[in-house]
Swiss-Prot record:
GO BP: any one term: glycogen biosynthetic process
Protein's gene: glgB
First-level EC class: transferase
Role: Catalyzes the formation of the alpha-1,6-glucosidic linkages in glycogen by scission of a 1,4-alpha-linked oligosaccharide from growing alpha-1,4-glucan chains and the subsequent attachment of the oligosaccharide to the alpha-1,6 position.
Annotated family: Belongs to the glycosyl hydrolase 13 family. GlgB subfamily.
Source organism: Shewanella sp. (strain W3-18-1)
Protein name from the UniProt record: 1,4-alpha-glucan branching enzyme GlgB
Amino acid sequence: MMTQANAYFYNGADVALLNGQYTDVFSLLGMHTSEDGKSLIVRCFLRNALKVDVISIKDGRRVAGLEKVNDAGLFAGTMGRRVKPFLYLLRIQYPLSQIEIVDPYQFGPLLNADDLYLFGEGSAERAYEFLGANWRDVEGIEGVHFCVWAPNAKRVSVVGDFNHWDDTRHVMRQHMANGLWEIFLPNVAEGAHYKFDLVHPNGERHAKSDPMATQMECAPHNASIVPKKSKHSWKDTLWMNKRAVTAWHKAPMAIYEVHLGSWRRKGDNGEQYLDYQDLIEQLIPYVKAQSFTHIELMPISEYPFDGSWGYQPVGLYAPTHRFGDANGLKAFVDACHQADIGVVLDWVAAHFPKDPHGLVRFDGTCLYEHEDPRKGTHPDWDTLIYNYGRGEVRSFLLSNACYWLREFHFDGLRIDAVSSMLYLDYSREPGQWLPNAYGGRENLEAISFLQMLNQRLYQAFPGICMIAEESTAFAGVTKPTDHHGLGFGFKWNMGWMNDSLSYLSRDPIYRQYHHHQLTFSLMYAYTEQFMLSVSHDEVVHGKGSLLHKIPGDDWQKFATLRAYYGFMWGHPGKKLLFMGSEFAQRDEWDHNHSLDWHLLAFEPHQGVQRWLKDLNQLYQGMSALSVLDYQPAGFRWLDCDNGSASIFTFVRYGLAGDAPLVFVINMTPSVHHGFRIGLPQAGDFCEYLNSDSYLYGGSNQGNAGLVVAQNQSWQGMESSALITVPPLSCLVLGPVANQVEAKRR
């Protein structure tokens, strides 16, 4: 005798469904034509439901009631004489309530074949548009399309506020060929919390955050959040058009590196972060007033541990909750652009943390990482390394880079820890790593990924800047990919940074023995397109602030720091300075507290801040300081061998017709009168800038603004002049005829 169950569920499908072992649920639940083609059958699984009716969406009429097949919550029934599928609601009677929902199992697959191909191939640039949680309109019905990559999972369900976190309620459709799971859910609200519930190959169940979530809960919670439907209306067309035609390797770039959580805080005890509106009102005017060209944001992808500063993100697509939502971040970038300020984002693609709700063994297998810890584990940070050879992982990362550039209008990415990506033996002892196919230590898969990434991003987003934090001598980081380079636009000059800060920390009396630490960088300055960076890494972990590194009394510390900045701004290469360094913060950076803005009540700190502002204005006003940054013709030593006096003199050149600039840097407290220097052209010169001016807190020694040229050749120049070189100072001299281009000091 046929029972209620086997009248609608064949071959034990009902038992398999109840036990969570029926993975092809879309072939069973929802609306289907009967085997004889003469009727429609609707099946559903609704725990605790008492009664279920099928309602036509078109006319709102009740079509049929479903039979309760068993007490577990299986319902099924035929649709009378109807044989043509139609859109319907389920009217569900519970013990204490009645609700109506659109049955998600009546919808077919929504994934596009081209998207699936590109995702698997490793070249998808918009995977976030079909993976994760995306608002869709299907046959006039609005809802959220959930999709996740989990090829080895036995079952995947989406659970959340909308289904009481019931893993049996919304089991997803499996695409066997590519490992994707999807479901379209109407009746989901903006801001709903959700996760993916996965049954691993060994039968264990684990709830995971959505790898493509665009919003997440704050720690210690870790649910993903359905995004808002509202979109930001961009007003930065002028900037975007200008950016697209700007050759940044020839343009001034003075980048202000910012940790949004500690630049400034609010609250009675500084316990609250500034939100994006606060940052629009405070950070942007400050950066503009200081004449920086760009802001670089330390990572803002969602991260659970404050002490990671964002460098161990779990939600790579989700702007952190700390400062506001995605629209708030877009408004901040938009406001920066309207103020003519570019915004670069720190991007972490070298590794990811082991937080159990994250990517680690996502479907019960090493999906994003390598199985072998000799390739998959980062020894320094106890994190996991992406499997750059897997197409889907490449698409995940490529799409994420595109996501920040396309959806948030960021002007470039600074890729963190590139060195750890390039070498298989990075921070490993012999026997702790596996060689590549040719027996070498280069990570060929990571190299290929970086080349592909840079090539595609520069092609898709004209005028962006791709910046590498790379600390080794790996050749060709900024060479084009068609010349076998990695294709970055710029590379941090870690050698210059280490040498110059080492020099800075020495007593002036001993600097003569370390003169090469400031001159050696010019031996390799044109091998890459370098960026001179003094970043957050140099003012933490007991290293002290820049001011703290310098020996001597306060006057010497401040004077030396001003001279150092002058040398940095005169040296070929773009500039990056971490927040707080521009006003000589005394204590090393603490991410838990605001910068010490109260120091600006004191003249020495005001002087350094004013000096940086004037350096930036000179930098932007004089093309000789940027247009030939990466060509030897843009720089010439006048004297690089005066170690006994610790004085450095050089010329910066621009294109034909551009005024040259002479830099004189004295790194001892000695004053030099009647000091002869060569001049790059005939005619008198003036002091464009003098770091020893009283305006900056100096002793106000110098040349009264004017340097009189003499027809005496010197240092390979036809003209020369006798000047006064102030103590611990930087002088910037330029032709009198061009002094209107710069602020005269």
